[in-house]
């Protein structure tokens, strides 16, 4: 099967991620004002509970099944066999997880039971998800367009129908059901690439067992966030969960933008690994340096615009977002870097046990720190706990990659920090004279980009370094 070009894949994924990025920028202000911190907290708390079940139901989707498919793209018979075996394995697992979820919420949940019930639709969406097939065959057009339509549906419902806390159920139902509906086009186009074959039950079992190794990698981004939100909900209040969730939603938008390139590169890097190409190490190093050039200014930019941004975006009830973001902003650099090293090196070369060990230890550290620090410092304790955990993991990752002689371009990184700090100073001065409006924020972003790019060109920053 002929794969789409890397350029085309990046365009389609970039378009989808742009829409995915823009949608929350429109919906979050509406939801924050309609539901308030406590309403946002209820939605976030229930979603983070279902996230633990989704981690199991979606095991292997992004990081394993697409690689299995990528190895079979040139043989239609083998490709078809792999697809149906993976799909059946996923389907049985997800339906079992859904049954477990229903039992848990029936026994333990009294308040807001309907909200928790509707969140369970996400697990049905995970059961039907076949995006891994299109990722493995490097055909991102169909899933990207389908996801764009789904984002449009969510946006329309929020803008037209969400008015106050009585619309909580409608909102949760809408965002959950689109995860099911946006799979329909993927199934319709599937017949172009594969045919129906009998399921090999032995292979289904083998796939299931192998995919379990990717349980923690699959939930890397969500695991620690879920821990923070759940502990906040149990130890603190739904209002604190709402404020923390909204702040982290902004970070997630930035992280999603950075990870677009990462996800598109996985099938290509897998092929490099199979061919034992020496370009794997060089590609990893280049991608890390490019990522830092993008994320360093994002960190300083977020801190600079937040004092005026939160007022028009979240509302005055979310004032705690400003000091919270000052702590959390550095995660825009740390989390994508952690994920890049994990996806483009550790998982590609099958260092799954090492990766799982680091994530498990990180989860324990994060949980212990959350329980201790949230009790004393509330949402700021959750932020500090997450920051410490991610920093420990990053040090661990750097120790791993030094063994294959992957090095950062230190000079370039220092120049980026200098440029970003100068940009931060300029934005701080300009922000002092601007009103807290959307247009002022857009102007600040534009000024920040121009200042940063001019400083980069002045210092003649070398993106790739010497390898």
Regions found by a protein language model. Give the residues of each.
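Helix-loop junctions and terminal segments of transmembrane helices
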Residues: 29, 57-74, 251-295, 341-348
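N-terminal membrane topogenesis motif
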Residues: 1-23, 77, 191, 201-217, ...
């Amino acid at each position: 099967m002929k794969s789409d070009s890397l350029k085309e894949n990046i365009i389609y994924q970039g378009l989808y991620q742009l829409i995915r990025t823009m949608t929350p920028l429109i919906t979050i202000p509406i939801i924050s004002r309609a539901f308030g911190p406590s309403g946002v907290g209820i939605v976030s708390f229930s979603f983070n509970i279902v996230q633990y079940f989704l981690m199991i139901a979606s095991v292997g989707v992004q990081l394993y099944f697409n690689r299995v498919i990528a190895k079979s793209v040139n043989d239609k018979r083998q490709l078809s066999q792999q697809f149906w075996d993976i799909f059946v394995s996923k389907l049985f697992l997800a339906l079992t997880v859904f049954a477990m979820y229903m039992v848990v919420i029936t026994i333990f949940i009294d308040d807001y039971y309907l909200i928790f019930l509707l969140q369970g639709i996400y697990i049905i969406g995970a059961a039907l998800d076949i995006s891994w097939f299109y990722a493995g065959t490097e055909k991102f057009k169909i899933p990207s367009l389908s996801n764009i339509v789904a984002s449009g549906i969510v946006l329309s419902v929020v803008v037209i129908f969400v008015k106050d806390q009585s619309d909580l159920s409608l909102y949760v139902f809408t965002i959950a059901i689109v995860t099911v509906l946006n799979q329909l086009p993927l199934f319709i186009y599937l017949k172009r690439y594969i045919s129906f074959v009998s399921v090999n039950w032995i292979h289904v079992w083998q796939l299931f067992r192998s995919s379990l190794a990717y349980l923690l990698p699959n939930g890397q981004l969500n695991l620690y966030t879920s821990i923070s939100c759940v502990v906040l909900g149990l130890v603190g209040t739904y209002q604190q969960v709402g404020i923390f969730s909204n702040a982290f939603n902004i970070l997630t938008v930035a992280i999603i933008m950075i990870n677009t390139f990462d996800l598109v590169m996985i099938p290509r890097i897998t092929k490099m690994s199979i061919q034992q190409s020496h370009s794997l190490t060089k590609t990893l190093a280049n991608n890390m340096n490019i990522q830092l050039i993008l994320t360093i200014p994002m960190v300083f930019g977020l801190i600079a615009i937040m004092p005026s941004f939160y007022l028009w975006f979240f509302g005055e009830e979310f004032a705690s977002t400003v000091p919270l973001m000052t702590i959390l902003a550095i995660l825009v650099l740390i989390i994508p870097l952690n994920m890049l090293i994990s996806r483009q090196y550790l998982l590609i070369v099958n260092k799954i046990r090492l990766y799982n060990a680091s994530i498990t230890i990180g989860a324990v550290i994060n949980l212990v720190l959350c329980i201790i620090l949230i009790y004393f410092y509330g949402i700021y304790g959750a932020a500090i706990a997450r920051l410490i955990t991610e920093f420990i993991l990053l040090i661990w990752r750097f120790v791993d990659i030094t063994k294959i002689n992957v090095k950062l371009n230190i000079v370039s990184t220092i120049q980026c920090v200098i440029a970003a700090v100068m940009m931060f100073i300029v934005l701080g001065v300009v922000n002092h004279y601007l009103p807290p409006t959307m247009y002022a924020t857009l102007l600040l972003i534009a000024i920040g980009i121009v200042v940063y790019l001019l400083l980069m060109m002045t210092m003649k920053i070398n993106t790739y370094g010497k390898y």
